Amino acid sequence: MRRILSVLLENESGALSRVIGLFSQRGYNIESLTVAPTDDPTLSRMTIQTVGDEKVLEQIEKQLHKLVDVLRVSELGQGAHVEREIMLVKIQASGYGRDEVKRNTEIFRGQIIDVTPSLYTVQLAGTSGKLDAFLASIRDVAKIVEVARSGVVGLSRGDKIMR
């Protein structure tokens, strides 16, 4: 089962490697990882997407709390939350395929950010499912040349904050 963890940690040298080391030492896979400083430059927020059952997730959370740099851990899937991912995709198309790429980009509320005679580069933001659906929608009419995805970022909805 897909899980998203939000981790608030000190913005210190080595903090990221200690979290990654915890996952690799225990054989847990990280599907995606994003990390950046928060509005407080001494803190970073890390969003980790992983796969596991309730028991595995509980173990991961307990181990994360033991790390000295980690201040808070929250599973975003446990309540109302918003999540987004950004994707850049380079698409090769001609004729009808170019029209379909433009049409699908509009439908999915993306942006064409670069154009050459044979390629479009499209930027799209949304849930992972939305990005996957966009890729599926153009596979039959164009060739996907290259894809770069940011990984999931997310926050709890409403008054719940992580400080």
Curated annotation (Swiss-Prot):
The UniProt record lists the ACT domain at 4-78
Q: Which GO terms describe its cellular component?
A: acetolactate synthase complex; cytosol
Q: Does the keyword Repeat apply?
A: no
Matches recorded under Pfam families: ACT_AHAS_ss, ALS_ss_C
Top-rank lineage group of the source organism? Bacteria
Activity modulation notes: Sensitive to valine inhibition.
Pathway note? Amino-acid biosynthesis; L-isoleucine biosynthesis; L-isoleucine from 2-oxobutanoate: step 1/4; Amino-acid biosynthesis; L-valine biosynthesis; L-valine from pyruvate: step 1/4
Reactions listed under catalytic activity: 2 pyruvate + H(+) = (2S)-2-acetolactate + CO2
Q: Name one GO biological process term.
A: branched-chain amino acid biosynthetic process
Similarity comment text for this entry: Belongs to the acetolactate synthase small subunit family.
Q: How does it assemble?
A: Dimer of large and small chains.
What other remark does the UniProt record contain for this protein?
E.coli contains genes for 3 AHAS isozymes: ilvBN, ilvGM and ilvIH.
Q: What is this protein called?
A: Acetolactate synthase isozyme 3 small subunit
Where does this protein come from, organism-wise?
Escherichia coli (strain K12)
Give the encoding gene's name: ilvH
